[in-house]
Amino acid sequence: MRSFYHYMMRYRGNIQADEEKRLAEWMFEDHSFPKQATSYNEISSYLEWNIPFTNALTVFDRLYDAYQIEED
């Protein structure tokens, strides 16, 4: 299973500026982000402590669900 970070890199460079791109760009630029993580708890805890924008956790929850479906 690839990491959630790797899954999110598909949203980098999107022409349309949306919340998915915003989160992916932030993850890329944050050198402390747990790039090898696949665990919901590990990633959500990190985001709770280092929230990049107001609704980042909502965006994360939605994208993590899609990640699980695609990776299973």
Would you name each region that the model predicts?
Residues 1-25:
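N-terminal acidic leader/helix
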Residues 19-37:
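A short, compositionally biased N-terminal segment around positions ~18-40 that is enriched
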Residues 36-65:
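Short, charged early-sequence alpha-helical segments and their helix-coil boundaries
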Residues 69-72:
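Short acidic DE-rich linear segments
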Residues 11-12, 27-31, 47-50, 63, ...:
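Generic structural signal for hydrophobic core residues of well-folded globular domains
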Residues 13-17, 33, 53:
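Alpha-helix boundary/capping and short turn/kink residues
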